Amino acid sequence: MSEMIYGIHAVQALLERAPERFQEVFILKGREDKRLLPLIHALESQGVVIQLANRQYLDEKSDGAVHQGIIARVKPGRQYQENDLPDLIASLDQPFLLILDGVTDPHNLGACLRSADAAGVHAVIVPKDRSAQLNATAKKVACGAAESVPLIRVTNLARTMRMLQEENIWIVGTAGEADHTLYQSKMTGRLALVMGAEGEGMRRLTREHCDELISIPMAGSVSSLNVSVATGICLFEAVRQRS
């Protein structure tokens, strides 16, 4: 069994973390620029089989996405399960979690994972029924974060949130109509941040299970932000407070 990843950053990140997972790599014939050559040499030094391919082949393998001239066939990484969450929390003194409710675009999922990794988030939790898949597109956008941040899919998000609360984790959800802002919220300690889908926001039951609702203050004429942008803003306010 294998999966495909593509893009310079995604391949580079996996090579640094788990070179043993590579099975073969396809490089665009004739592309030997200064960004790709060091990566090719690093792959060869690990004994990875490299094959040259034409653009049509790479486009087909990546479903027409931007692959930057490199695609890798790799062994699947660790798949985190719902029952891994209690042990993960037990191992942490100050858990810092991100919950994504209804983020169905793989680009947004990948961008949120990238921000989560940069912010030091310990795990990202998503519902099984309303979430984008961690496919090659999401992994490319994540720029390696998909290999470092556990992504945990849960059957019942409200039940998982209750479990987190039983573990003394404070759950902060984002909502445009919240009566106080991100910058008025205390985001230290044992924390889970909940981000809803663009437009729709969090589902009713998810909202009801939050301990606190906050908004991002908006100064311009737009009424909302892309979910990955909003996630980055909230995560790094938490980082500021926690540092």
Curated annotation (Swiss-Prot):
<dbReference type="InterPro" id="IPR029026">
    <property type="entry name" value="tRNA_m1G_MTases_N"/>
</dbReference>
<keyword id="KW-0698">rRNA processing</keyword>
<dbReference type="InterPro" id="IPR013123">
    <property type="entry name" value="SpoU_subst-bd"/>
</dbReference>
<dbReference type="InterPro" id="IPR029064">
    <property type="entry name" value="Ribosomal_eL30-like_sf"/>
</dbReference>
<keyword id="KW-0963">Cytoplasm</keyword>
<protein>
    <recommendedName>
        <fullName>23S rRNA (guanosine-2'-O-)-methyltransferase RlmB</fullName>
        <ecNumber>2.1.1.185</ecNumber>
    </recommendedName>
</protein>
<dbReference type="GO" id="GO:0003723">
    <property type="term" value="F:RNA binding"/>
</dbReference>
<keyword id="KW-0489">Methyltransferase</keyword>
<feature type="binding site">
    <location>
        <position position="216"/>
    </location>
    <ligand>
        <name>S-adenosyl-L-methionine</name>
    </ligand>
</feature>
<dbReference type="Pfam" id="PF00588">
    <property type="entry name" value="SpoU_methylase"/>
</dbReference>
<feature type="binding site">
    <location>
        <position position="225"/>
    </location>
    <ligand>
        <name>S-adenosyl-L-methionine</name>
    </ligand>
</feature>
<comment type="similarity">
    <text>Belongs to the class IV-like SAM-binding methyltransferase superfamily. RNA methyltransferase TrmH family. RlmB subfamily.</text>
</comment>
<feature type="binding site">
    <location>
        <position position="196"/>
    </location>
    <ligand>
        <name>S-adenosyl-L-methionine</name>
    </ligand>
</feature>
<comment type="subunit">
    <text>Homodimer.</text>
</comment>
<keyword id="KW-0808">Transferase</keyword>
<dbReference type="InterPro" id="IPR029028">
    <property type="entry name" value="Alpha/beta_knot_MTases"/>
</dbReference>
<dbReference type="GO" id="GO:0070039">
    <property type="term" value="F:rRNA (guanosine-2'-O-)-methyltransferase activity"/>
</dbReference>
<dbReference type="Pfam" id="PF08032">
    <property type="entry name" value="SpoU_sub_bind"/>
</dbReference>
<keyword id="KW-0949">S-adenosyl-L-methionine</keyword>
<dbReference type="InterPro" id="IPR001537">
    <property type="entry name" value="SpoU_MeTrfase"/>
</dbReference>
<dbReference type="GO" id="GO:0006364">
    <property type="term" value="P:rRNA processing"/>
</dbReference>
<comment type="function">
    <text>Specifically methylates the ribose of guanosine 2251 in 23S rRNA.</text>
</comment>
<dbReference type="InterPro" id="IPR004441">
    <property type="entry name" value="rRNA_MeTrfase_TrmH"/>
</dbReference>
<dbReference type="GO" id="GO:0005829">
    <property type="term" value="C:cytosol"/>
</dbReference>
<dbReference type="InterPro" id="IPR024915">
    <property type="entry name" value="23S_rRNA_MeTrfase_RlmB"/>
</dbReference>
